[in-house]
Structure formats: C-alpha cells, structure tokens
C-alpha cells in the first residue's frame, strides 16, 4: 500500500487509513477455481463476454474476451490500491462486437459497506442486474447554500458553481448539462452548457419558502437533448435539518434516483466474485520501531534462542490461511532492513530442525516455505522474465497442438486442418514428442545457463539453504539428492513450473492462454516439475503416458545438478551489499511501444502528431526512442512527474490515451500524451508510472482530462491554458504487482494485526496460567530456561502491542473529535 500525499494522509501527526482491495481467485499450481462466470440465457445462441472492473468511476481492469461462450471462465486476479474516499466496486459484463458498440449484458455493484460487512470478504454468485441509465451516474457538484430571512420571510439562496466528471451521454463523449433546483413546490434551472462534462455555471438561484412543513433541497443535473427526453446525470438532496444547522458548502457526490426495488436480473445470468477489502490505519514509523526491533533481534540472536524468540511466537500464532500474506510482509520488512538473508536463514534453520524425513522437507505451506516463495517472486521476477519470457511468447504465438495422453488426443484435428487422413495415435505421439522437446530444450538451456543472471540475494539464500540441509542430514545416503531437492523444490516447483503453467499470474503475458495453449503449457510445466524433482517419481504408476519424455527428463536432471552446484557457489563479497530493495532504481519495470505526442505541436495535423516510440520506465527515468536498438534517447526524470491521468477519448478522438504532467526547474508544467493499444495496457502503464512517481512532492490535486486545442480546453471549455485543472487526479489508484515498492510502515502494521489475532492465545498459553508449565514442558521437551525465555518474549510482545493499541486509540480519538465529515475536497 502506497502512502498518499502527506497533506491528505496525516492528521495532527497521525496518518489516515489506507486501503487495499484484493480480488483473489484461489489459484493453486495445476488448478484454478472458477472466479468469474456469467451465464446469460441463450438468446442468439452464443456471446463473446468480457468483464470490466471499475473502482468508483475509474476502469481499473478488463478481462480477456471469451469467444462464443455462454458460461465463460476468466480466472482473473487483481490487487488494487485504493484512494481514501473509495466508495464502490462494480463489475460490468459486456458482449464484444467487432462492428459497432459492445452490448452491456449486466452488472453488479458492491458498496464499500457491503464488502466490509464480513471480514472474510465476499465469495459467492451474484445475479447480474440491468444497467439503468438513470442509475449510471458519476461525478460531483459544487454548491454553496445560504438560508436568509427578510421582511417577506425565509429565502434559500443556492449558488451553483460547477460540476466535474459527469457521465457522458452524447455520442461525442460529452454532455450538455444543466442544473434544476427543487425546494418545496418551487423549482429553478441554470443555463445549459454545451459539450462538456465539466460545466462552470457560477449562477445564484433564489427560492422563497412556501407555507407548510419544511422541505428538503434537491439539486438534479440533466443532459439537455434537442430531440427526445433529457438524460438524467445525478442528484444530491439535503434534509431541512441540514439546511438549518449546516448549509451545504463544497463538493458533493452525485447519486442516482432511489429505486423502489432492485432488479434481480435473474434472466441475465450471474457472476461469481471473490473480493476482500483490507483497510488499515498506518501509523508513523516511530510507532512501529519497538515491534520491528523485536523481530530483528529474533533473526540476529543466537541460534539456541530460536524457539523462544518473538518471531517464533508469531509463527506459532499464524494460521495457514494467513501465512502467505504475513510471509510477503515479513520478507518486504526484512528486505528494507537489508536482512532478508538472515531472516530466511532463521526460518530455514527452524524448519530443517523439526523435519525428520528429508523427503518431506519444505513440502508443507509453512512460514518458511511461503517466505522463500514470496522472496523469489519479489526479488527474482526480472530474472524469471529474462529466462522464460522468450519461450513462453513463442508457445503463445505458434499455437502448436501437442498431446501425449491418449485419452485426450484429438486425432481428427490434423485432418480438419490439412484435409489429409487422420494420423494414428503413434504418429500423433511422435509429433507431439518432437514439439515438446523442441520447446523444453531451449527452456532448459535458458535455465541452466542463467547462473550469472540470477539475483545475488537469491543465490545467497539458496547457499544458506544448501548448508542447513547438509548440516541436518549429513549421512551419505542423504547427500546424493537432498541437498539438491531443497533448492530445486523452490526454484523449479514453486517458481519456474508455476510461471510456465500460468504466465499471466507472473506478468509473462497480458492474458490467460486459450484451452489449446493452456494444455501445451501444462505439459511443459509437468516436464519441468519432473526435472525439478530430479526424476525421482518417473515411472511410478502415475501418468505413464509421459514415458516418451523420460529420456529427455533424465538427461536434463544431470544438467540441473550441475546448475545448482554453480548457483550456490557464491560468497558475500561477490554478492555485494545486502539487498534493501526489490530491484535497483535503474531497473526497467515496464517497456514497450507506445504512441507519443507532445502538447499542441504548432502547425502539425492532429492525426500525424502521435508518433510511434519505444518507451522504458525505471525508478529514475521515463525514456523514449524510435526503436529498442536506437542509441539516441529522450528521457524525463521520474522525479519531475506531477500527475499521471487518463485523457478523454474526445480530446483527440482516440481511445486509450494517458497524460504525463511534468514540472521543469522553473516551475512550468509540461504534458506528454501517450496512447496504448488497449485498456489493459493503459491501466498497466498508469499504475507503473503512478507507483514510480509516488514519492514525488507537490503532486497535482487536479488536472485537465482534455487537451488545449483551438484556444480552449476540450474538457471544461476554459480559454486559459494555465487554468486550474477541472478533474481530480487518481494517484492512489494502482494495480498491485511484483514491482510494488517497499512500504515498511504498512508491512509492520500487518504484523501487528496478525499478533492481535493471537493475543488472547498468547496470554493464555504463556503468561496467565502458571499451571501450564509442566504440560508445556512435557509437550515440547523444553527445559524451564526455554519456557522462561518464551514467557519473557511473550511479555515484550504484549507490551509492544499495548503501546500500538494506545497509538491507534489516539488516532481514533482524533477522528471522533473531528468536525462531522464535510463535503468532498477539491
């Protein structure tokens, strides 16, 4: 979770809450649980559905289109970092049309309250509802209301200033908005402003109070249409009590008309989603310092105190379903301190010490296994991309049919393609075997030849693991394979093989594979997994149809042993200083071809203004050149970026355009426009640029989603190029992935939250019941000295938790003492 700007995050020295939205498909290697499925009735016989995911009014993701299906499976997973004022999550299911506009099948909307009602989140089928234009509202309106009295009675003065980010109702992507104010039986209207979603009225409407009971104030926004009825854009309403005690003054979110009953949409199908919202109050760094120091002491302390350390107690209190999240946060926390190696060595030492059978080493989902797995994903993702991406891309592009299992062979496939006779089962097997080895050969060549490219931190972690296993199992019968299996079990079974099986989850591809390619990837992943197991399970009764591959697999095993020997042949001096980040600032986090345009090039026709450029983004620069091989590059320092936002389609009559607003040394703002191929690429670039520029000061709170053309802004129609931005920026909305920066405070907060869950158990088990000493000693074999150290560690943990409790209570007290929540900010 990234920190928002200090000006919005901190309140009297304490920060506001941060939020993280997780969409989790429950994926396991070799198995995907159905996450999103829509089942519309067979109207035309088939559909080409895809799903849009929106946070409030911002599209954050688009799934792949599943062609010719009434029951598609997407299996998409998204982690979204949210702004503080997040209100709603929506899923729109659409039918893609190659000609004309895509048809909306239906949608589901989940309010923030609905998601947080159950701490476990939502995991269920939800019926799609019809998309009602009167309910599809967005944006905000700025009002200032006064209640006045004179000799003729009471008067309501409503100053309608402006609105922003209204829903587009016209085919041009804009609207013709006007406001209508109701008070009692009276109503007045503002003027209509044509072709804008960001109207500025600055009009004052006065209404006299009529006899009778006090009336609420309602302000409606409408899109004026010359032909047909006007389109509803949204409304706000204020009770008589609010008008009397605290007249509205500021920005207010537009709401739809209340509906008598919700459309169940039973005939539209249903969507299955799994959503979890994590909202944490993240305190200043000094509040977490005692907790962090306790965890560091656990890692740096003597080995004989492993079982009595605070980190050991944390491991005991963590349930299986929480271990992955905790492992990720702990790895990041220790990475930021340069202690990832000692942390992994500590967990490895404990795991190896309690393992009796070397064949079961690291096979469970223990904290040690999960931490090493997350460490590889965090530190080794660029390495994984370098090794596997070329061959994965080749498999996707060539779309070869491969099958060894006779029960799954489609012998008529070749005949349908080539109009020749169907091949025999043996011919199909030989052809598939040649294709599989043709892919596996380069994959294994890339892996065994990648020693020099493997991150030094990973090599040191594997060396420590290698040493601990040799010390625990020194007998000759163990030495042959155990020292290799411990490493290959992580590197091959938990890293390479899962990445081959599901490339999208490892950012190797933008979309999931089609069924045929997915089967090819499964066969390749099975082969790599067998090699990672050093061929120990070959020919043991399972999947005997893989036997034709056995000679290749056994030949590769000897190469893997040599590769692992070279991989762990590294020392601290060669590895350099301990890693304190996921990757160096100069590392490329995203690259690819985009269309680039500078702001308003004079005398150049607009359709020629966008030029194809190859773009690199690192933590330091955003660079452009004509091609990847081109030596001349133009670069923008990431530290100069002040906003990264979408651009309305109507600005250039082009879709998927974003803007990067930078500030030079003289304080002048400059805008670079970039066009992406599709909405997913747009979201990925937006997210990457926002995360890279997150630490920058002086971020813009608002900018223009249009372009300055023909002496005015296309969005708000203002004539001054220097006019203040008309739309709020969305710097807090980013997609979570492997390139997320370290955030020590948020990671420490997660550890604190996990300890809170086990605090009562900790008190009962190690502090409050002195009669448990004898039973605990009998169960664990621990001596009284160990029990005393455990009790002391628990006491220190509970003391730290109490201090953090008081800090959080102080924050909550400040929240309670705040004036009632006011209108939306600028």
What are these regions (language model features)?
Residues 48-52, 59-60, 66, 70, ...:
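Conserved tryptophan-centered aromatic signature that marks the ligand-binding surface of SH3
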Residues 1, 51, 58, 75-112, ...:
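Eukaryotic beta-sheet cores, primarily in C2 and C2-like/PH beta-sandwich modules
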Residues 1, 33-43, 61-70, 124-130, ...:
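The phosphoinositide-binding surface of pleckstrin homology
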Residues 2-3, 130-132, 214, 235-611, ...:
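Extended alpha-helical scaffold/tether regions of large eukaryotic proteins
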Residues 40-42, 49-51, 78-80, 173, ...:
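Polybasic phosphoinositide-binding surfaces of eukaryotic membrane-targeting domains
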Residues 53, 111-123, 133-135, 181, ...:
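Pleckstrin homology
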Residues 1-73, 79-178, 182, 579-581:
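Acidic, S/T/P/G-rich intrinsically disordered/coiled linkers that flank
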Residues 1-36, 42, 117-120, 124-151, ...:
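Long, low-complexity intrinsically disordered regulatory regions
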């Amino acid at each position: 979770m990234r920190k928002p700007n200090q000006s919005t995050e901190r309140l009297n020295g304490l920060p506001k809450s941060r939020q993280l939205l997780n969409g989790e498909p429950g994926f396991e290697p070799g198995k995907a649980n159905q996450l999103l499925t829509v089942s519309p009735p067979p109207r035309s016989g088939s559909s080409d559905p895809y799903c849009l995911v929106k946070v409030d009014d911002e599209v954050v993701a688009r799934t792949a289109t599943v062609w010719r299906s009434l029951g598609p499976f997407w299996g998409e997973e998204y982690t979204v970092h949210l702004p503080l004022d997040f209100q709603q999550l929506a899923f729109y299911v659409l039918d893609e049309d190659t000609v004309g506009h895509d048809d909306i099948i239906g949608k589901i909307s989940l309010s923030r309250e609905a998601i947080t009602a159950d701490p476990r989140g939502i995991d269920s089928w939800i019926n799609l509802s019809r998309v009602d234009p009167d309910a599809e509202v967005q944006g905000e309106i700025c009002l200032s209301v006064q209640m006045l009295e004179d000799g003729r009675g009471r008067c309501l003065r409503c100053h309608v200033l402006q609105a922003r980010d209204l829903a587009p109702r016209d085919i041009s992507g804009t609207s013709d908005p006007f406001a209508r104010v109701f008070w009692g039986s009276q109503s007045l209207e503002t003027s209509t402003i044509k072709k804008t979603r960001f109207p500025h009225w600055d009009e004052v409407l006065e209404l006299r109070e009529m006899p009778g009971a006090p009336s609420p104030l309602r302000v409606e926004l409408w899109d004026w249409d010359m032909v047909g009825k006007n389109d509803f854009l949204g409304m706000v309403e204020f009770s008589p009590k609010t008008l009397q005690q605290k007249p509205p003054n500021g920005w207010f979110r537009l709401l739809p008309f209340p509906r008598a009953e919700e459309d169940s949409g039973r005939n539209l199908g249903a969507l299955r989603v799994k959503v979890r919202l994590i909202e944490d109050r993240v305190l200043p760094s000094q509040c977490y310092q005692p907790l962090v120091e306790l965890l560091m002491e656990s890692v740096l302390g003597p080995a004989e105190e492993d079982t009595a350390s605070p980190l050991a107690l944390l491991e005991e209190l963590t349930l299986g379903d929480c271990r992955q999240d905790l492992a990720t946060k702990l790895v990041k926390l220790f990475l930021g301190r340069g202690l990832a190696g000692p942390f992994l060595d500590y967990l490895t030492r404990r795991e190896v010490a309690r393992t009796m059978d070397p064949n079961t080493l690291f096979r469970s989902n223990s904290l040690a296994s999960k931490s090493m797995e997350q460490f590889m994903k965090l530190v080794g993702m660029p390495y994984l991309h370098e090794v596997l991406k070329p061959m994965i891309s080749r498999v996707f592009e060539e779309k070869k049919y491969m099958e060894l299992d006779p029960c799954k062979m489609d012998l008529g496939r070749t005949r349908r393609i080539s109009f020749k006779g169907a091949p025999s089962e043996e011919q199909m097997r030989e052809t598939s075997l040649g294709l599989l080895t043709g892919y596996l050969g380069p994959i294994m060549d890339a892996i065994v030849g990648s020693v020099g490219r493997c991150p030094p931190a990973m090599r040191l972690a594997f060396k420590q693991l290698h040493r601990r296993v040799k010390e625990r199992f020194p007998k000759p019968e163990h030495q042959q394979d155990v020292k290799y299996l411990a490493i290959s079990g992580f590197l091959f079974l938990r890293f390479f093989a899962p990445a081959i099986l599901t490339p999208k989850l490892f950012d190797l591809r933008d979309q999931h594979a089609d069924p045929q390619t997915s089967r090819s990837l499964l066969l390749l992943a099975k082969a790599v997994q067998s090699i990672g197991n050093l061929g120990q399970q070959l020919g043991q009764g399972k999947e005997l149809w893989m036997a034709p591959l056995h000679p290749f697999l056994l030949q590769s095993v000897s190469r893997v042993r040599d590769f692992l020997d070279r991989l762990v042949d590294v020392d601290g001096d060669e590895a350099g200083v301990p890693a304190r980040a996921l990757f160096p600032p100069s590392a490329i986090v995203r690259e690819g071809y985009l269309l680039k345009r500078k702001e308003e090039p004079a005398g150049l026709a607009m359709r020629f203004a966008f030029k194809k450029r190859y773009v690199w983004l690192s933590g330091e620069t955003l660079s452009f050149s004509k091609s990847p091989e081109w030596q001349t590059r133009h670069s923008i320092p990431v530290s100069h970026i002040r906003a990264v936002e979408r651009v309305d389609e109507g600005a250039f009559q082009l879709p998927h355009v974003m803007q990067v607003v930078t500030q030079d040394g003289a304080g002048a703002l400059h805008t670079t426009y970039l066009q992406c191929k599709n909405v997913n690429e747009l979201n990925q670039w937006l997210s990457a640029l926002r995360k890279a520029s997150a630490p920058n000061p002086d971020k813009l709170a608002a900018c223009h989603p249009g372009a300055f053309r023909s002496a005015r802004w296309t969005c708000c129609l203002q004539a001054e190029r220097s006019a203040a931005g008309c739309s709020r920026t969305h710097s807090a909305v980013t997609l979570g992935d492997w390139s997320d920066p370290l955030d020590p405070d948020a990671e420490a907060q997660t550890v604190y939250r996990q300890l809170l869950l086990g605090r009562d158990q900790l008190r009962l088990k190690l502090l409050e019941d002195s009669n448990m000493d004898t039973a605990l000693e009998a169960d664990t074999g621990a001596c009284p000295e160990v029990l005393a150290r455990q009790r002391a560690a628990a006491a220190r943990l509970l003391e730290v938790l109490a201090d953090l409790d008081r800090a959080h209570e102080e924050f909550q007290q400040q929240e309670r003492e705040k004036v009632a929540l006011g209108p939306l900010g600028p």
